[in-house]
């Protein structure tokens, strides 16, 4: 290590201390991994406490715990890392010793213990999403990790990874330290003057003045994602007046990237990419979340557009010779009303023998996207269309996804079709696969189809083409619905599981501002399409895995995380469901179905998602066949075939199916290339899902802010879904949000937690609104950054007051480490996604339904408040600076509460009880923060 350090710092007169171990050379990793000396996996960092990280690996039956920044060794969220295993007992003992040392350091520094606790259970981080993340990522004496390790190399990193954030002149902890020192000095001088002692004049004052006037060499970039460290940025890359006017940039969002991270530096060095705009605006926050999730929203370049066919385009004559002609077959699409990329259609033909031909017809994207072209490479790089509330970011150019490939009615289209001969009971007798030419006769929305299922006529506004009529389509919809119901019943009898995730629909005005919101509920029309898409995907999986047992791209879903599943079952037992069975997907579904109480079923359905793992793409030749299984669907083989316009994995599967039907012995990509594409699609699919959820969160925050400004505090009913000793978790059904209510933010005189019953007894301060500021809690400030830095630094070295080594711009990492941050790293230009793991297809089919007109959410008419004199900026300030309007309980709809007869002004909080909460949104933070407070029933 010392030799490498000397080589990296040849001009150093004084050897600087190495804070991290150098990475092992990439060439040395394969044999070490093969021999089991190292294991590889994907790193994730705890959102509440970035000192805790975990590596998920196929090699072990549990995650590897990475304790502290030093053992994480400069690895970032999502990196593929090589890990050397360590003795868990030794790691745990070291962790306890460091925590004790850190605690003493905090006490000596005068850091408020309450804020230390707040750092561990970060309200701001909790408020940046719609749902809570997992508590059991936090290791404790009761939940010690099974495996521990340290990162010895970063094997893969997302190329060109960007981060949104803010700029600061000084490192946040340095600023806070100087403020504390100044306050301490002022206090000491005041005491001296009171004692008649003249304070000593600082003789180095002039020197400090000169030091102050010296222009700093770096400024600090603070990413909005707390899992990413502060990044040192050269001052010349900041705005020209930043040093003099840095306070005026406090609310400006920038984008930066990491360029290098020397082993002698606590923080990485980076480059400022661009300035986005002011925090809080929908456009600015949307651009930020796209950057944070590495979503490419740039226009398609000239090399890509050159691959597109000339317009007008017609189907070549030779295709009529090679394909089955289905133009006269009654085929129609059922999609969200706003959908433009129509990539799936269905058909139903009655046969003379009483059986049916049921067809699923998918846009033949692979006809236009040829392997190893610029268009193909760009589609692979993007990997998926990203659906936001107000827009989508397409995987393919609009000419393809909205015109040539989209199955528009009345137009001849190229398709890949699967046609089953099916009995009236839904039993498949034969399956036909092949390329076809179709001419859809109608474009239906889910609402149109649902009206027919409900017994109403098809909406007269639906245009019918190709000499077909409304009655025929109505009959087809009803028959498809009946068959879908039978298929669904059979699927669940075989042991399938469906846990619907909470999704929001927004109605937007002409400026794309949210005006209404509701929780999305799937209907029979959605399930109709879902069942046939699932059947198509399963059928194709069987075909391609049979043809290419070593090269097929499939999709698997691993069983739930055992410890989390056990905790969930214990939770169900506490609620009185002693016979709750979660030994299989089918058993879990039956247990949930047996719950009669609506609240309990809704809560347990939500909590059952938390032990589940994400479904993932994989290549058959790289994994043991025992791991192919899809847990939730209970399918032995499954893939994605039905959405090639918006998923690159489906494009590859189409090519595999075509190769299988052509009788090819081997697919054109080997198993390593297929697996590399599968892994890339997994990463991009996860990023797309995160972006979609963050977009919904952003629009909900804006809606909550607007409702508050218009009508006063937003108050809704909530269900308690979990109780802790200092907090309780609630579900707010009206907005589909899950939040933690912290007791130290409520106007309580005292509270008592009963370990035996798991109940909380709150004693409220009478006449005090929950929105009035709490003296001991003044919101978020720079001290939160101090605590994060104290935590990180304590794990690295004893003395981090002097950051002179960060100024060393001569220190260079190895070429291999440099390439980790290289935006031009080849993710596969020359080489050759998960929604909630449950209801896999139903979630994806309806991604565009987030921007629709929906029934209004009832807005509680609280006492009107004159906000004309309060600017938006003032309203979003810390509660310590402005007192919101007082809420009186008698002005709200009455809600029965349970109280303790021995405690005045009391309220008992237990699981499944209902209470009123006030929901606030702070749009002056990025991402914006939602906070939920229990309403004081005695105010």
How would you name each of these model-derived features?
Residues 91-143, 174-215, 461-466, 770-899:
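Intrinsically disordered, low-complexity domain-flanking/linker segments in eukaryotic proteins
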Residues 1-344, 386-387, 441-450, 758-759, ...:
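Terminal, basic amphipathic appendages of nucleotide-handling enzymes
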């Amino acid at each position: 290590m010392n030799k490498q350090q000397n080589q990296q710092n040849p001009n150093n007169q004084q050897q600087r201390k190495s804070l991290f171990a150098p990475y092992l050379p990439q060439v040395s990793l394969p044999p070490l991994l093969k021999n089991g000396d190292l294991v590889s996996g994907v790193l994730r960092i705890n959102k509440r406490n970035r000192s805790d990280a975990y590596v998920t690996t196929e090699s072990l039956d549990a995650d590897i715990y990475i304790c502290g920044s030093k053992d994480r060794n400069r690895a970032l969220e999502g990196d593929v890392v090589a890990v050397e295993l360590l003795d868990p007992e030794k790691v745990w003992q070291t962790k306890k010793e460091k925590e004790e040392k850190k605690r003493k350091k905090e006490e000596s520094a005068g850091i408020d213990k309450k804020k230390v606790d707040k750092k561990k259970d970060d309200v701001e981080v909790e408020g940046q999403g719609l749902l809570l993340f997992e508590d059991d990522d936090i290791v404790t004496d009761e939940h010690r990790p099974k495996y521990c390790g340290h990162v010895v190399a970063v094997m893969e990193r997302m190329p060109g990874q960007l981060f949104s954030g803010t700029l600061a002149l000084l490192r946040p902890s340095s600023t806070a330290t100087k403020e504390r020192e100044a306050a301490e000095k002022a206090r000491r001088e005041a005491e001296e003057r009171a004692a008649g002692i003249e304070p000593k004049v600082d003789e180095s004052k002039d020197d400090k003045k000169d030091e102050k006037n010296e222009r700093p060499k770096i400024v600090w970039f603070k990413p909005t994602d707390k899992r990413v460290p502060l990044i040192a940025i050269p001052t010349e890359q900041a705005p020209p007046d930043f040093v003099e006017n840095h306070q005026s940039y406090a609310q400006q969002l920038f984008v930066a990237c990491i360029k290098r991270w020397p082993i002698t530096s606590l923080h990485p060095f980076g480059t400022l990419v661009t300035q986005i705009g002011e925090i809080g605006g929908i456009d600015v926050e949307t651009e930020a979340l796209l950057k944070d999730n590495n979503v490419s929203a740039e226009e398609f370049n000239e090399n890509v557009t050159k691959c597109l066919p000339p317009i007008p385009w017609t189907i070549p004559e030779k295709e009529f010779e090679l394909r089955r002609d289905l133009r006269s077959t009654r085929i129609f699409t059922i999609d969200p009303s706003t959908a433009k990329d129509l990539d799936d259609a269905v058909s139903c033909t009655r046969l003379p023998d009483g059986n049916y031909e049921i067809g699923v017809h998918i846009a033949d994207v692979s006809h236009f996207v040829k392997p190893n072209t610029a268009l193909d490479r760009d589609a692979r790089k993007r990997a998926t269309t990203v659906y936001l509330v107000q827009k989508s970011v397409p995987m393919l150019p609009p000419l393809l996804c909205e015109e040539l490939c989209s199955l528009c009615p009345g137009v001849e289209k190229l398709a890949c079709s699967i046609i089953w001969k099916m009995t009236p009971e839904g039993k498949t007798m034969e399956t036909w696969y092949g390329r076809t030419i179709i001419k859809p006769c109608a474009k239906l929305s889910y609402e149109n189809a649902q009206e027919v299922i409900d017994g109403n006529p098809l909406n007269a506004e639906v245009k019918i083409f190709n000499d077909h009529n409304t009655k025929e389509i109505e009959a087809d919809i009803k028959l498809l619905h009946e068959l879908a119901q039978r298929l669904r019943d059979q699927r669940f009898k075989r042991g399938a599981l469906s846990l619907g995730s909470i999704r929001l629909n927004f109605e937007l005005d002409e400026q794309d501002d949210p005006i209404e919101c509701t929780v999305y509920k799937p209907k029979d029309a959605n399930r109709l399409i879902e069942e046939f898409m699932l059947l198509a995907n399963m059928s194709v999986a069987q075909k391609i895995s049979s043809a290419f047992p070593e090269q097929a791209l499939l999709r698997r879903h691993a069983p739930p995380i055992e410890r989390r599943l056990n905790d969930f079952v214990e939770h169900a037992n506490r609620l009185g469901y002693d016979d709750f069975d979660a030994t299989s997907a089918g058993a879990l579904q039956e247990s949930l179905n047996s719950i009669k109480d609506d609240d309990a079923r809704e809560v347990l359905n939500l909590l059952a998602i938390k032990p589940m793992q994400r479904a993932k793409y994989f290549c058959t030749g790289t994994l043991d066949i025992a791991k192919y299984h899809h847990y939730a669907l209970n399918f032995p083989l499954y893939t994605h075939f039905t959405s090639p316009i918006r998923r690159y994995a489906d494009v590859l599967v189409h090519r595999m199916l075509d190769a299988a039907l052509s009788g090819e012995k081997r697919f054109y990509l080997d198993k390593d290339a297929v697996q590399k594409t599968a892994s890339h699609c997994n990463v991009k699919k996860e990023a797309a899902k995160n972006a979609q959820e963050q977009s919904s969160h952003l629009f909900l925050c804006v809606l909550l802010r607007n409702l508050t400004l218009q009508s006063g505090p937003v108050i809704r009913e909530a269900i308690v879904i979990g109780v802790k000793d200092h907090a309780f978790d609630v579900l707010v059904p009206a907005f589909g949000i899950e939040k933690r209510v912290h007791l130290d933010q409520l106007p309580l005189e005292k509270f008592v937690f009963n370990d035996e019953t798991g109940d909380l007894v709150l004693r409220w301060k009478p006449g005090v609104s929950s929105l009035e500021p709490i003296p001991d809690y003044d919101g978020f400030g720079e001290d939160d950054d101090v605590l994060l830095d104290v935590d990180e630094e304590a794990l690295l070295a004893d003395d981090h007051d002097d950051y002179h080594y960060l100024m060393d711009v001569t220190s260079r990492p190895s070429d291999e480490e440099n390439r980790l941050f290289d935006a031009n790293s080849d993710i596969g230009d020359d080489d050759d996604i998960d929604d909630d793991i449950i209801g896999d297809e139903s979630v994806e089919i309806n991604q565009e339904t987030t921007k629709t007109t929906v029934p209004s959410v009832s807005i509680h008419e609280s006492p009107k408040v004159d906000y004309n004199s309060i600017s938006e900026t003032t309203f979003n300030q810390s509660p310590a600076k402005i007192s919101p309007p007082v809420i009186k309980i008698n002005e709200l709809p009455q809600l029965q509460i349970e109280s303790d007869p021995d405690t005045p002004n009391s309220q008992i909080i237990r699981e499944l009880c209902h209470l009123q909460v006030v929901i606030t949104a702070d749009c002056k933070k990025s991402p914006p923060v939602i906070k939920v407070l229990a309403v004081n029933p005695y105010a």
